[in-house]
Amino acid sequence: MRIIFSLFAFLLIATYANANNNKERFYIMPYEQQEAIKDLTNSIMQAKTKIDIAIYSFTNREIAKALREASNKGVKINIIYDSGQKKAENSTIGYLEKFDNIHTCLLEGKTARNGKYNGIMHQKMIIIDDNLIGLGSANWSKNAFENNYETLYFTYSTDTVKKASHYFKDMLKQCKPFI
């Protein structure tokens, strides 16, 4: 009986530890650049229904190709870019906008109290299937993943995903179409 109980306890602990390890993933670049980009692109490719992205600067072709492939599988994708990225060299906005299932738009930050300037949309966030969220300091550029000191964090936290989704929807309503 003791052996059965010990085996059961071991399996329970092993299952909990494994489930907990898959709930959160944290990368520090440039040290874990390969793992971070692989996790991000794999997460995109595993999406089933929808991907919501708010990203300040997005020039990384590998990530753009993963989004194109996801859209080809029928995944609906919304990407909010900072309004200043409309004319940015190498931005993926024009490339991704032309694909079915990908909607891109531009968002400007709030107007300063003095009315003289606007803030920026400086998020670096991806929400996949209202289930997984990725957050970090890194823009989606080759330089950010390979040379900069940046972070990328993934979690399945229901509360975090729900809160981020709420604010993403609000930002999306304020977004102006990319034309």
Residue positions per predicted region:
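Sec-dependent N-terminal signal peptides
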Residues: 4-13
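Sec/Tat signal peptide C-region and signal peptidase I cleavage site
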Residues: 15-19
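Acidic, metal-coordinating catalytic cores used for nucleic-acid/nucleotide bond scission
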Residues: 56-62, 84-87
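Beta-strand acidic-aromatic groove motif in beta-rich domains, primarily in extracellular
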Residues: 64-66
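HKD-type phospholipase D/PLD-like phosphodiesterase module
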Residues: 20-46, 69-179
